[in-house]
Amino acid sequence: MKMRAIVLALGTTLLLSGCQNMDSNGLMTSGAEAFQAYSLSDAQVKALSDQACKDMDGKATLAPASSTYTQRLNKIASALGDNINGQPVNYKVYMAKDVNAFAMANGCIRVYSGLMDMMTDNEVEAVIGHEMGHVALGHVKKGMQVALGTNAIRAAAASAGGIVGSLSQSQLGDVGEKLVNSQFSQRQESEADDYSYDLLRKRGINPSGLATSFEKLAKLEAGRQSSMFDDHPASEERAQHIRDRMAADGIK
């Protein structure tokens, strides 16, 4: 998935809490350094993920515990396990038509009802496995490091002024645009696909759902309907890669 929504939520939280004394000229000229690597510890990534997840949950419509969506996701979650590299995970459903899902470094896993409406349990398992892969393989951490590479966001993160302030809409838009354009590379997407395949095999789950989920997404792409895989390698190629792995492993 794209880091867009996650990083935008994170950046906005940082900006609104600590930029009151930032020089606007410096902010507008920071574009040349927009994608410099910014060093973050695992603890910092987790803390920032906590903020971003809380912000997104606050803006979303969450499915209640009694919802059939939540009950279904809980069943799926029990099959996938309760941690990513030792980090405990928690699952929630966003009631929205988007075909999307994401995972954060703090174990925050969110699935949109639109994706659940479109896919079988096996396919949802595969998609979640893919998102877990982005966390386990360090892609999420790298994405945050890139997004936090701007002088503007770096200053916001380091600010200790303590006085709540805000930037103008144009300034927020300038920084937000840099954050919104952050996304995983095709190589990272392919690595996450293989992670999901291996995870499903390890958990005794048939990986065919990974291939069929891509085939469904290929139909969305043909109809030009936006989905979580807009920036990923072609879905047909990804489906074939999974079927090739299944054939090599003797799985029908």
Label each region the model flagged.
Residues 10:
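A glycine-rich, hydrophobic loop/mini-helix early in the fold
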